[in-house]
């Protein structure tokens, strides 16, 4: 599966006290153990079984062997159609496969997905399959922000956030850290500028005041997870 790699113990951006900014669309695609499947690794801790955040690209007709998610798997479909024996998932699909679940993923037309592995709270056994293109939106923390809730469990919150063009977002802090993947549009803050494909991880206790670009922005945003318990990796 996505996390099998024949390397020595790998540590990539595992210090959650540090800010990480990656412009993923400029990163090279690296081969995975499965033919036709490549990835961009954003953070990673572990050997063959790893706690990892990646962007994964399936070529048309590629697939993985059946595998079990020992620590859970979270997927957001960015492009194309991702599939397994349970269904077909178009762009905007949000999936959570809790610890102990098994599937055999593939893609007939090809796809690009954002994947987080082995990052479930030990008590979280909820399966999620949400089509965000048809999802409902509610008000965010200030006027000009709309939020679609994807998942929430014991202080960890995952949402899609839609922000109006040229919006100045009020200064706010991230007590449990924050992670953003820019899906559309762009924004800037005190630490940098971010466009489609930018991934930023802000440490617990950090703060910022984003200014949204002239075309607005659509973000995948997770908060609280950098201080939350997760399933332990096997020894």
Task: Annotate each predicted stretch with a short phrase.
Residues 37, 88, 99-123, 204-230:
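Ligand-binding loop in jelly-roll beta-barrel domains
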Residues 3-48, 110-155, 235:
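A short, N-terminal "cap"/entry segment at the start of jelly-roll beta-barrel domains
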Residues 83-100, 189-208:
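Short acidic-glycine-tyrosine-enriched beta hairpin
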Residues 64, 76, 82, 95, ...:
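Fold-core signature of tandem repeat domains
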Residues 59-62, 69-84, 174-190, 196:
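Glycine- and acidic-residue-biased ligand/ion/polar-headgroup-sensing regions
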Residues 132, 138-184, 189:
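Surface-exposed interaction/gating patches
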Residues 54-55, 65-69, 86-87, 105-106, ...:
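Short histidine-centered beta-strand/loop micro-motifs
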């Amino acid at each position: 599966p996505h996390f099998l790699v024949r390397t020595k113990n790998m540590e990539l951006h595992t210090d959650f006290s540090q800010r990480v900014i990656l412009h993923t669309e400029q990163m090279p695609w690296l081969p995975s153990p499965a033919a036709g499947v490549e990835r961009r690794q954003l953070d990673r801790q572990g050997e063959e079984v790893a706690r990892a955040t990646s962007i994964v690209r399936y070529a048309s007709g590629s697939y993985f062997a059946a595998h079990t998610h020992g620590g859970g798997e979270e997927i957001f479909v960015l492009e194309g159609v991702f599939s397994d024996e349970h269904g077909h998932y178009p762009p905007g699909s949000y999936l959570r496969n809790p610890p102990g679940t098994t599937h055999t993923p593939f893609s007939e037309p090809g796809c690009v997905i954002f994947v987080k592995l082995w990052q479930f709270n030990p008590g979280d056994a909820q399966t999620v399959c949400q089509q965000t293109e048809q999802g409902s939106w509610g008000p965010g923390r200030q006027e000009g922000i709309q939020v679609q809730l994807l998942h929430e469990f014991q202080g960890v919150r995952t949402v899609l956030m839609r922000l109006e063009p040229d919006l100045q977002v009020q200064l706010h802090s991230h007590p449990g850290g924050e992670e953003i993947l820019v899906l559309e549009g762009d924004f800037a803050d005190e630490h940098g500028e971010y466009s489609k494909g930018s991934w930023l991880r802000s440490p617990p206790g950090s703060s910022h005041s984003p200014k949204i670009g002239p075309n607005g922005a659509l973000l995948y945003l997770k908060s609280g997870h950098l201080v939350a318990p997760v399933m332990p990796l096997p020894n």
